[in-house]
């Protein structure tokens, strides 16, 4: 009987991401991953680790150095430590999966990339939203050509909520652009084709956060030959109606959320033939009129199945299944680090445009 190779995992950080996301996901893939070490600075959390996992928890990630029973280290430390700790791990011979944001700045991420290259290690960033079922379905629909050429994508992450934890503090590499932004930014750059010549507009504000970081972000990305991308992250809008996914196309459009998508489009062969008219439009009795036609529109929808509907879970499992293939067979991983680097450059430009907020 064929037995899958298990990836032996060390997890740094046992908080909301480490315990509630990464541990929860990997416990659902027991044939592919197993935990062999945990690292947590908080004493009470270390006791929790030992109760819940039966594994002794370490206080310092440097206690992992020299061990040969670890295939992958998941770095779910504080955001401001992601790049520094990843660099140390890579330089000491470990393959690393880091939580987002990959870094608080471009320079530190480039240092980590250099360490990975110099030491022959693999370095991944947890951008699991690329694997969200609704996002992948949206990409499939656009690729079919039914909507024509996409003119604009809009990605909305809106809600109405106050926040007062450490992830509201700008100096902790936090705020909405770094906390939430990596997900819609990853989508936007993906649909744009990751152009290097990209124009960035970004407006930020503080609505009711208790820290000095932003909790409102409006970002517009443009590049030659690419669709416009409109990203909105707001903690100040509590009404529905602003779907997560929107596509404006030359022959149709799409809208929806993780709970379902709907799209409509017309087929060229079914559309009434029209020609440009430069004289004023009128009826036979000379009454002025607007353009008007009966344009047959086809409407379709997609509803996720039971597993796809558990989006928070399914996109993470999709990510870890793809990562497993990369680690065990050498299959190319979908998300490349030069894509993450581009995202960080745009993030730096966004903060530069709003520097007065953080003086």
Q: Locations of the language-model features?
A:
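C-terminal helix-rich "cap/oligomerization" subdomain common to oxidoreductases
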Residues: 1-4, 11, 72-74, 294, ...
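Charged, glycine/proline-rich intrinsically disordered loops and linkers
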Residues: 267-307
């Amino acid at each position: 009987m064929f037995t899958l190779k298990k990836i032996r995992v060390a997890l740094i950080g046992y908080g909301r991401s480490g315990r509630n996301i990464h541990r929860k996901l990997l416990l659902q893939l027991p044939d592919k991953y197993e935990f062999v070490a945990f690292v947590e600075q908080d004493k009470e959390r270390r006791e929790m680790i030992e109760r819940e996992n039966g594994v002794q928890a370490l206080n310092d990630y440097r206690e992992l150095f020299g061990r040969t029973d670890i295939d992958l280290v998941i770095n779910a430390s504080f955001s401001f430590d992601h790049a520094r700790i990843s660099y140390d791990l890579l330089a000491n011979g470990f393959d690393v999966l880091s939580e987002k944001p990959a870094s608080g700045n471009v320079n530190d991420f480039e240092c980590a990339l250099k360490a990975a290259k110099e030491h022959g290690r693999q370095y991944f960033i947890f951008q699991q939203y690329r694997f969200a079922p609704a996002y992948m379905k949206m990409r499939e629909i656009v690729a079919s050509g039914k909507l024509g050429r996409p003119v604009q994508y809009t990605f909305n992450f809106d809600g109405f909520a106050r926040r007062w934890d450490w992830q509201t503090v700008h100096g902790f590499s936090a705020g909405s652009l770094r906390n939430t932004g990596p997900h819609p930014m990853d989508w936007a750059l993906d649909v744009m084709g990751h152009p290097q010549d990209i124009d960035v507009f970004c407006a930020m504000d503080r609505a009711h956060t208790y820290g000095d970081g932003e909790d409102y972000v409006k970002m517009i990305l443009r590049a030659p030959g690419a669709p416009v991308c409109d990203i909105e992250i707001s903690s100040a809008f509590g009404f529905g109606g602003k779907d997560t996914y929107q596509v404006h196309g030359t022959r149709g459009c799409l809208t929806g959320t993780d709970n379902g998508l709907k799209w409509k489009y017309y087929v060229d062969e079914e559309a009434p033939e029209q020609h440009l008219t430069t004289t004023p439009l009128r009826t036979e009795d000379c009454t002025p009129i607007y353009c008007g036609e009966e344009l047959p529109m086809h409407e379709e929808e997609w509803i996720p199945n039971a597993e796809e509907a558990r989006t928070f879970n399914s996109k993470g499992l999709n990510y870890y299944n793809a990562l497993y293939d990369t680690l065990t067979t050498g299959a190319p991983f979908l998300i490349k680090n030069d894509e993450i680097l581009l995202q960080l450059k745009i993030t730096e430009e966004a903060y530069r445009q709003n520097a007065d907020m953080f003086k």
